[in-house]
Curated annotation (Swiss-Prot):
It comes from Acanthamoeba polyphaga mimivirus (APMV). ANK repeats lie at residues 1-26, 27-56, 57-86, 88-109. Signal peptide: none annotated. Keywords: ANK repeat, Repeat. SUPFAM superfamilies: Ankyrin repeat. It comes from the Viruses. This is Putative ankyrin repeat protein L482. PANTHER family: REPEAT PROTEIN, PUTATIVE-RELATED, SURFACE ANTIGEN BSPA-LIKE-RELATED. SMART domains: ANK (SM00248).
């Protein structure tokens, strides 16, 4: 359930589940990937604080955040070392295909 709840941005429920023993790295860290894809920065930050791997699945979290135009999440993940060049510059390609100019400008700056 943690992955689904993270993707919905319910931070208090995420915290509760983690406190009850939910594994944040289940399914290759998909909780942080889902939160990133949906733009839930507070959840992303919390999961990072719980040692979620931002680079799992070839940096899928930053790639999905880019493709969905979630600039604040992209900035946060990049500042932590996410690789925007993984998968042949997928983050930039995806942001471009989906018309997210602010994300593109940030990624190429």
């Amino acid at each position: 359930y943690l992955t689904e709840i993270s993707g919905k941005g319910h931070i208090e429920i995420v915290k509760c589940l983690v406190n009850l023993g939910a594994n944040i790295t289940t399914n290759n860290n998909y909780a942080i990937i889902q939160a990133s894809e949906k733009g839930h920065l507070e959840v992303v930050k919390y999961l990072v604080g719980q040692n979620a791997n931002i680079r799992s699945e070839n940096n899928l979290a930053v790639r999905l955040a880019s493709g969905n135009g979630h600039l604040e999440v992209v900035e946060y993940l990049v500042n932590l070392g996410a690789d925007i060049r993984s998968e042949n510059n997928y983050a930039i390609q995806s942001a471009s295909q989906n018309g997210h100019l602010e994300v593109i400008e940030y990624l190429v700056a």
